[in-house]
Structure formats: structure tokens, C-alpha cells
A protein has these predicted regions:
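Extended, solvent-exposed functional surface patches
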Residues: 1-177, 183-206
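Non-catalytic carbohydrate-binding regions of carbohydrate-active enzymes
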Residues: 206-213
Length: 213
């Protein structure tokens, strides 16, 4: 005999209100929404002097995200590289310590290095590479490098080799709009990695009918 519990389907919702109070005070009405299960959850109210609190929550969420496919790792690397300095200036108690962030970045670089395909690209895990995903990972490495982190240089060079020939990696069944968008993204990331290709950029613009089209 097996007993299986049947739980009440319940979830939580979060709402945010932003504004400025130069002087005086403000009253914020709170009303219980209809259809709630009063035996679950509760009401939690937090305040912050800056809208950066929402960014802190997002970075912490990505930092602790348990499912590490290459797309998710790259997204975490980008968020930490882009927001580390700003969020650290506010000394949020919810942020990991600088040493923990540094260790996390190093671990993510190692995972990406191990999972890189011999062609220089990345799949979601260790399967055949996907062109857009490869550019996304390379973009993350570029952002991290700009912030002083040290991803493996050979990994970056292999990724650049893939990006330089991105056209050959785009499947023929991709849509007409997807192909030039992917090529444009690859040119942008190559430029951030100090590998500019203005000639390819000009050709892409010309093929699209010019910048005023």
C-alpha cells in the first residue's frame, strides 16, 4: 500500500511599488486578493531606498540557480560581470561575498571550458553546438574579461574561431530574419573581444538594404 499526499495548489506572488518621497509620508493600501488560501503563505513587506534591490534579487537568484546548462552559466556570468560593481557599492547583505563570487566565476569558466566543442562552440550541455548559444557564451566571457576576470584564453580563441565562420554554423532551416541577426550578434561580440571585422559588418548592412531601410 502506498500513500500519496494531495497538496493544495498554492503559489506566491510578489508586487513592487516605486516612487519618491521628498518630504512627509505616504500611505500604501494593501488588500487581500480574492481566491487566496488563507492557510498558506502570508504577507511580507520590505522597503528599500533604491530600485537596485530588484537587481540584487535577480543576481542572487542566478547565483544560486541549481541547473547549470551552458546558457544558464553564461547568463550568470554576464549578470555578475555587469552588476558586480554597482551592487557591491550598496553593500547589500543578500549578495555573496567577493571571495564567493570570484570562486563561482572560476568554477563557471572551468565548466564552460570542459564543455566546449572541438569546433569552438557550445551546446546547451555537451551536444552539438548551437550558433546563438555559442555567441551568448562568448559574450559572457567578453564581459567577464572586461571586468578583470580571467577566463581561459585558449577557450576564448577557440570561440573566436567559431564566430569568424559563424555563417557555416547556421543551419539552413533557420528563418530569413534569424540568420542576419545571429551574424550581427557575432560581429558585436567579436568586437568586444578585440577582434573587429568592419568589412563583414558593412557587407551585412548592405545585404540588409542599408541602415535607413
Amino acid at each position: 500500500q502506498i500513500e500519496l499526499p494531495v497538496w493544495t495548489p498554492a503559489t506566491t506572488e510578489a508586487f513592487a511599488t516605486y516612487g519618491e518621497i521628498d518630504q512627509g509620508a505616504i500611505a500604501q493600501p494593501v488588500k487581500m486578493p480574492p481566491g487566496v488560501f488563507p492557510q498558506f503563505g502570508g504577507l511580507e513587506i520590505t522597503t528599500s531606498s533604491t530600485q537596485l534591490q530588484a537587481l540584487t534579487d535577480a543576481v542572487v537568484y542566478l547565483y544560486n540557480y541549481p541547473f547549470d546548462c551552458n546558457e544558464q552559466i553564461a547568463s550568470r556570468v554576464i549578470s555578475i560581470a555587469a552588476l558586480r560593481d554597482v551592487l557591491s557599492a550598496f553593500k547589500s547583505k543578500d549578495l555573496p561575498s567577493p571571495a564567493a563570487i570570484e570562486a563561482s566565476m572560476k568554477a563557471d569558466f572551468e565548466k564552460l571550458k570542459r564543455r566546449q566543442h572541438y569546433s569552438g562552440g557550445w551546446g546547451f550541455w555537451q551536444e552539438q553546438p548551437w550558433p546563438f548559444l555559442t555567441i551568448h557564451v562568448a559574450h559572457a566571457l567578453a564581459r567577464a574579461k572586461e571586468k578583470g576576470y580571467k577566463p581561459d584564453e585558449q577557450m576564448i580563441q577557440r570561440a573566436l574561431r567559431y564566430l569568424r565562420s559563424i555563417e557555416s554554423h547556421i543551419p539552413p532551416w533557420y528563418g530569413e530574419e534569424a540568420r542576419p541577426a545571429i551574424i550581427a550578434y557575432s560581429i558585436y561580440v567579436r568586437n568586444r573581444l578585440k577582434d573587429p571585422d568592419p568589412a563583414k559588418a558593412k557587407r551585412l548592412i548592405a545585404e540588409a538594404g542599408g541602415v535607413d531601410k
